[in-house]
């Protein structure tokens, strides 16, 4: 923990397999946060044996943070705060999380969400790429939650999300009054059960210049897209939906209502997941697999 908080700018931490705890000050076996004050890279050496980091990150001065090929485990955290919490206003180049599993636990462990930006941070890029993210209930915050920040690009690519934000919004992006040119992209993601209590997948109020929603599978949710007139209608392409009763039903008139738009090109098919309860979203329906939707590793039925 002290090595990360005192890292030199641009330092790379290459981790061998094993467990690395960001121990709480109380020395009671729980884990806490580390403040990242300088730009760093944290990566696992072996793709087949990822190191486990127990704890969470507070971005407090770092202008570039890259996390690759690790497991981020919040099960021992002594607070319910987000996996990534931006603490300092100002310019930042990027937060990129790739090839990583992020897991909480029921009743704790990142219970407030995955990422929180409640300062006037102007960020070039926030990206989650090829990540499995699960068991983050979102009690006290939305899953991705930006209240005051701004990102030129916000990307979720080739990710699997399950057991997340059952009663909160999937992506919340308020107007931080910094800029309005964000391109928000959700591509090749498998999203199961998110925002299931009639919440929103896109609670976006900052006037994004473009929202791209492509090549995704969304299943088993009562969510709507948005009830906000400021949410720009996405560019939809090649998406599959199953057991999403409200998502593609427009309930909207005169700039208000319960659901502002739908995916006009939606395909409604059961992907026949192998074992969703255990996090195995292998597609058993050949017709769905051939569409190459969702996270790429689940295309087994093709």
Where are these regions (language model features)?
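Active-site-proximal beta-strand/loop segments in catalytic clefts of secreted hydrolases
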Residues: 16-18, 45, 276
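Short glycine/acidic-rich loop motifs that flank beta-strands on beta-rich extracellular proteins
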Residues: 24-25, 52-58, 75-83, 105-115, ...
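Right-handed parallel beta-helix
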Residues: 39, 63-74, 92-106, 122-139, ...
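Extracellular beta-strand solenoid repeats
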Residues: 14, 21, 35, 41-43, ...
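Non-transmembrane interaction and regulatory regions of membrane-associated proteins
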Residues: 174-175, 182
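Acidic Gly/Asp/Thr-rich repetitive segments characteristic of extracellular carbohydrate-active
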Residues: 1-27, 286-295, 299
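Extracellular beta-strand-rich solenoid/capping regions of secreted or surface-exposed proteins
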Residues: 9, 22-41, 50-94, 117-120
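Acidic, glycine- and Ser/Thr-rich low-complexity intrinsically disordered tracts
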Residues: 228-302
């Amino acid at each position: 923990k002290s090595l990360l908080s005192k890292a030199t700018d641009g330092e790379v931490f290459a981790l061998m397999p094993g467990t690395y705890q960001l121990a709480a000050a109380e020395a009671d076996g729980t884990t806490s946060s580390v403040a990242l004050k300088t730009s760093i890279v944290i990566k696992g050496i072996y793709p087949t044996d990822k190191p486990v980091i127990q704890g969470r990150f507070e971005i407090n001065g770092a202008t570039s943070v890259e996390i690759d090929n690790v497991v981020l485990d919040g099960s021992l955290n002594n607070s319910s705060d987000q996996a990534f919490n931006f603490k300092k206003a100002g310019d930042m180049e990027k937060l990129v999380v790739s090839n990583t599993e992020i897991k909480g636990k029921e009743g704790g462990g990142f219970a407030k969400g995955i990422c929180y930006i409640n300062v006037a941070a102007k960020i070039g890029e926030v990206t989650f790429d090829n990540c499995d993210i699960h068991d983050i209930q979102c009690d006290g915050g939305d899953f991705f939650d930006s209240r005051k920040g701004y990102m030129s690009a916000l990307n979720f690519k080739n990710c699997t999300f399950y057991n997340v934000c059952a009663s909160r919004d999937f992506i919340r992006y308020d107007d931080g009054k910094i800029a309005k040119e964000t391109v928000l992209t959700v591509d090749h993601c498998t999203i199961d059960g998110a925002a299931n209590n009639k919440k929103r997948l896109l609670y976006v109020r900052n006037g994004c210049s473009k929202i791209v929603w492509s090549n995704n599978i969304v299943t088993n949710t009562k969510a709507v897209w948005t009830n906000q007139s400021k949410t720009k209608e996405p560019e939809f392409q090649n998406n599959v939906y199953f057991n999403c009763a409200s998502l593609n039903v427009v309930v909207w008139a005169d700039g208000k209502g319960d659901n502002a738009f739908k995916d006009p090109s939606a395909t409604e098919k059961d992907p026949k997941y192998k074992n969703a309860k255990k996090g195995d979203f292998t597609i058993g329906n050949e017709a769905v697999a051939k569409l190459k939707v969702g996270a790429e590793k689940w295309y087994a039925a093709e």
